[in-house]
């Protein structure tokens, strides 16, 4: 925490904050008309303090800061932690949170996800599995991209029967600190 704070710009971040009842699952409300969390403008120190406060809780509230531009919010961080990609200067983002999970989604750019602390499991699906992932509303989304309506931790196969086919094509990897994964453009991931 202190290391990240040493680069803090002091600008507030957008955090997704939910009570313990959502069990870390950033998702829609029951009508699919809104969300099961609130957006809050918090400073990095506040987010990190909340994460530390609830670190050992068996049912913590959810705190999640997603896809936050490193150059804007953590100036100088990149000079000490960048990947040497020769002439390429990709956008560098950071995701910070506790036991939070975003439903399967895709990103337009190819991504490299690096695990700095804790563990992070990724489940990837090739783009041709879109038809088996049951995508939710495209005009109202929790984090920008459409997401799957399937709860991967407790799939309802009666409601989403083709999800079993998607799982047959899934690739799963668990990252630990120092590990990285390349996520190709348009591949669905969770």
Locations of the language-model features?
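N-terminal accessory scaffold of Fe(II)-dependent oxygenases
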Residues: 1-180, 188-190
